[in-house]
């Protein structure tokens, strides 16, 4: 999915071209080894989704990105990158963005400290943008950690509730999407009601994004995902499709005995097959579509009709290609 093309906002491409050197500049120290570690995933690319949200929101009224707008986008992307460094250590992942993960290449200790370094740089940038943005980013880091801890705490719990799942993804994913939009709205000088509206869009968009990701973890391939498929199942992270399958009177009795323990590849494949063939995928898609509609409703409250249409397209694009059943 090419996010910039989908949004149909021509100036965004130029903004992102200006963003890339700032991202590199923000993490380069002059220490050759540390620079190699901190730029590893930057060099691998990525959708830059959170900076896109920040920049699209910031420029919704003027169309021109200021240095403050760009630095706000850098700050949220560094938080996202740091979370990937830490997540891959926790998951013992070996692949990220179709390249070696940082922990696989440099070791867990280096990956953890490098992730901390990225967070420190993000905080430093946010401090330069004012106390409101600095406090917002700090609060978001707390939400990210709370969501991640909630997910880890529920690992291998076959009786995990859907509310537990919703709370976890609201923290670990939706919070940073919301903050990306809010920081963009703040650096862009939008009215307070517009700031709040775009923040709400970002939160609902983040919920759609994570539910979609969890569906694709079941039905997607490693080539499509850029990481091994079924990784959450193997690690005991039971996401919405799995929880819905467990509640299904036909799939649940077959799936339940497989879970509650680490899964080898054969068991992982069998569990994915059970979930995919149940009605759980359609049920999860319905939830994703609900969040997409909420996101679209929030977007129309902004100052730009073009951006409202663009954000609505983006939210709908996340669900348009999901399987209905």
Task: Give names to the regions the model predicted.
Residues 1-325:
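All-alpha prenyltransferase/terpene-synthase fold signal
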């Amino acid at each position: 999915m090419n996010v910039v093309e989908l949004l149909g906002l021509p100036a965004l491409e130029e903004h992102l071209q200006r963003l890339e050197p700032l991202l590199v500049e923000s993490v380069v120290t002059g220490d050759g080894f540390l620079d190699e570690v901190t730029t590893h995933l930057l060099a691998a690319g990525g959708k830059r989704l959170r900076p896109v949200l920040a920049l699209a929101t910031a420029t919704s009224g003027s169309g021109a990105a200021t240095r403050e707008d760009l630095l706000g986008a850098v700050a949220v992307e560094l938080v996202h990158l740091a979370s990937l460094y830490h997540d891959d250590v926790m998951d013992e992942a070996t692949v990220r963005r179709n390249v070696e993960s940082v922990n696989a290449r440099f070791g867990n200790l280096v990956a953890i400290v490098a992730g901390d370094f990225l967070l420190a740089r993000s905080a430093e940038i946010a401090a330069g943008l004012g106390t409101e943005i600095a406090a917002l980013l700090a609060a978001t880091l707390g939400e990210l950690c709370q969501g991640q801890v909630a997910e880890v705490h529920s690992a291998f719990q076959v009786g995990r509730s859907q509310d537990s799942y919703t709370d976890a993804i609201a923290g670990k994913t939706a919070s940073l999407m919301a903050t990306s939009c809010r920081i963009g709205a703040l650096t862009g000088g939008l009215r307070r009601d517009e700031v709040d509206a775009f923040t709400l869009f970002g939160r609902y968009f983040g919920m759609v994004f994570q539910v979609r990701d969890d569906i694709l973890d079941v039905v997607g391939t490693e080539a499509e995902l850029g990481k091994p498929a079924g990784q959450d199942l193997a690690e005991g992270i039971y996401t919405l499709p799995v929880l819905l399958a467990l509640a299904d009177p036909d799939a649940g009795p077959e799936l339940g005995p497989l879970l509650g323990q680490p899964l080898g590849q054969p068991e992982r494949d069998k569990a994915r097959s059970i979930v995919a063939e149940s009605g759980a995928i359609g049920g999860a898609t319905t939830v994703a579509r609900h969040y997409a509609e909420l996101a679209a409703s929030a977007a129309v409250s902004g100052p730009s009709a073009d951006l409202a249409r663009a954000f609505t397209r983006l939210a709908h694009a996340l669900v348009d290609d999901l399987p209905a059943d």
